[in-house]
A protein has these predicted regions:
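Internal acidic/polar
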Residues: 3-4, 93-120
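A short, charge-rich alpha-helical start-of-domain segment used by transcription regulators
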Residues: 11-34
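Sigma70-family region 2
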Residues: 15-16, 53-70, 90
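Amphipathic, Lys/Arg- and hydrophobic-enriched alpha-helical face
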Residues: 26-44, 61, 127, 172, ...
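Structural recognition of an alpha-helix C-terminal capping motif at a helix-to-coil junction
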Residues: 35, 49-56, 69-81
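Arg/Lys-rich amphipathic alpha helix in sigma70-family domain 2
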Residues: 63-67, 77-97, 168
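Short, Lys/Arg-enriched C-terminal cap helix and immediately downstream tail that follows
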Residues: 88, 130, 135, 170-182
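Helix-turn-helix DNA-binding module
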Residues: 125-136, 144-161
Length: 182
């Protein structure tokens, strides 16, 4: 039995109320969901709360899952949305439109690609140092594979703003790594 068939069977068992299937879903996806939430919230307790709430929502709305996307992707979207919702409640996040004129010039000018090897921990530290809006967009796109268009809709900002912030986040990470770990 392949992964998709196994996953689909697990979803169907959950839909029928099989408690063992709920347990299996939780143990299969909890860590992945926690990591996604942590990349947004940067707080273990809040991230754990969002995972719990997300599982409750997912199990309550299991009938709405249509197999158009993967079940794992569906769960990740729920926890990402819950995490962003918590941030909005707490901070009323401010998104500033950024000027796109210099970005094309930077890309065209280019820069020599210095080859560096960094540990996962060094990269995670550099990401954690980003301003919150940079960190969120970088993680959603680069780590959670959410499209830039979808990020724009989630955060209620323009696509070009997402693109610019992502580009600047990458540059800040690169700069941080080169300055810190040369």
């Amino acid at each position: 039995m392949n992964y998709t068939t196994d996953q689909d069977a697990l979803v169907e068992r959950c839909r029928k109320g099989d408690k063992q299937a709920f347990y299996e879903v939780y143990h299969r996806y909890a860590k992945l969901m926690l990591n996604s939430s942590m990349r947004i919230l940067n707080n273990p307790a809040d991230a754990a709360d969002m995972v719990q709430e997300s599982f409750a929502i997912a199990f309550d709305r299991l009938e709405t899952f249509t197999y158009k996307s993967s079940f794992k992707g569906w769960l990740i979207r729920i926890v990402i949305n819950k995490s962003l919702e918590l941030l909005r409640k707490r901070k009323k996040m401010q998104w500033v439109d950024v000027d796109l004129t210099d970005i094309e010039q930077e890309v065209e000018a280019g820069s020599p690609h210095d080859e560096y090897m960094f540990t996962n921990e060094q990269v995670k530290t550099a990401i954690d140092r980003l301003p919150e809006n940079y960190r969120i967009i970088f993680n959603l796109y680069a780590v959670d594979n959410v499209s830039q268009d979808e990020i724009a809709k989630m955060l209620n900002i323009s696509y070009s703003n997402v693109r610019t912030i992502y580009h600047r986040a990458k540059n800040k990470i690169k700069e941080c790594l080169q300055n810190e770990y040369r």
